[in-house]
């Protein structure tokens, strides 16, 4: 506490205060390390869950996309996550997890007038600190739905198979709170996992079709 009289601290008292300061630093560092470990374990758990679903669902992409959306929202500390897949000239909503209703159309034209569309067209991540403040000028197509939903911070990453964009994964927050570099890196990993899963299902189906053809030819 504070002293009202002027009397210097003794060397022992100074040493004791230094010890308390060191202990505080150690405690803070311990909390940081514990949180990092918890985050790391959550990420590993999410990855192993996704791999498990891929293994259990080799011919059906839906359970995999649902799991990836749920994991992305949870691990990246977002209010929701959605995955859209390119289907002809539209981006079709394929999976959504989170309490925010999706007022945006289930199918969005592939152009720069929506966040997901722009991420796909430009083949790069789009990170917007406050979507609500720029939607009128930047993303007119989804202005009405953005205002209805109250979306603030948004991050979209394209799903790239080799050099071809095949869809997007997007996470949102209902407050202005940009995603950290770590969360951005994690969403890219989830995007990669989605691409692997989609490719896996495609190959499995192809293999099944070839086996059927082979069986018919042998009969």
For each predicted feature, which ranges?
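Signal-transducing coupling segments at domain and membrane junctions
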Residues: 2-3, 90-92, 99-105, 129-153, ...
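Flexible loop/coil segments at beta-strand boundaries within sensory signal-transduction domains
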Residues: 4-5, 87, 160-165, 174-178
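Amphipathic coiled-coil signal-transmission "stalk" helices
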Residues: 13, 26, 33-36, 40, ...
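Allosteric cytosolic regulatory segments
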Residues: 18-25, 188-195
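Amphipathic alpha-helical coiled-coil segments that mediate homodimerization
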Residues: 44-50, 54, 60-79, 83, ...
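GAF sensory/regulatory domain recognition
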Residues: 69-73, 81-112, 132
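A short, aliphatic-rich beta-strand micro-motif
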Residues: 112, 152-160
């Amino acid at each position: 506490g504070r002293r009202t009289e002027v009397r210097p601290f003794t060397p022992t008292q100074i040493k004791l205060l230094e010890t308390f300061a060191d202990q505080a630093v150690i405690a803070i560092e311990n909390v940081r390390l514990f949180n990092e470990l918890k985050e790391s374990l959550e990420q590993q758990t999410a990855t192993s869950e996704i791999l498990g679903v891929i293994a259990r669902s080799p011919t059906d992409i839906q359970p995999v996309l649902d799991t990836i959306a749920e994991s992305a929202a949870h691990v990246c500390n977002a209010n929701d996550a959605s995955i859209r897949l390119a289907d002809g000239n539209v981006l079709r909503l394929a999976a959504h997890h989170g309490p925010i209703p999706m007022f945006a159309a289930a199918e969005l034209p592939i152009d720069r007038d929506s966040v997901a569309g722009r991420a796909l067209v430009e083949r790069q991540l789009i990170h917007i600190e406050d979507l609500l403040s720029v939607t009128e000028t930047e993303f007119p197509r989804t202005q009405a739905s953005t205002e209805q939903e109250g979306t603030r911070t948004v991050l979209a990453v394209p799903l790239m198979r080799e050099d071809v964009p095949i869809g997007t994964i997007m996470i949102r927050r209902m407050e202005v709170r940009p995603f950290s570099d770590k969360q951005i890196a994690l969403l890219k990993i989830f995007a990669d996992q989605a691409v692997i899963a989609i490719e896996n299902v495609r190959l499995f189906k192809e293999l099944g079709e070839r086996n059927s053809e082979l069986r018919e030819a042998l009969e």
